Amino acid sequence: MNIFKILFILNYALIFLIKIYQNTLSKIFGLQCIYKPTCSKYSIECLKKYNFLTALILMTLRIIRCNALFKGGNDFTPKYKPILESLKEFKKRLIK
């Protein structure tokens, strides 16, 4: 099996796990995310739009930003240069 098939399978396996989270734990703990779309929806969008490694970096940066040290609001998946845009968003939203 080549690496592209493995990464494709990983993308959809992670989407499956996120959907399980959305339908179970997310409902138990309530909506805690400070962003629109929520971090789990953002993660699914990243996994559908980008390769596994890029999506993983974007998801990690977003989850790190989802706390009281950062300004919330609308934060959609970046269209161009996704990792660079996400890092800029990280710096821009940090509460000083």
Curated annotation (Swiss-Prot):
GO terms for cellular component: plasma membrane. Keywords: Cell inner membrane, Cell membrane, Membrane. It comes from the Bacteria. It is found in: Cell inner membrane. Coiled coil: none annotated. The keyword Membrane applies. InterPro entries: Membr_insert_effic_factor_YidD. It is a peripheral membrane protein. Could be involved in insertion of integral membrane proteins into the membrane. Belongs to the UPF0161 family. This is Putative membrane protein insertion efficiency factor. It comes from Borreliella burgdorferi (strain ATCC 35210 / DSM 4680 / CIP 102532 / B31) (Borrelia burgdorferi).
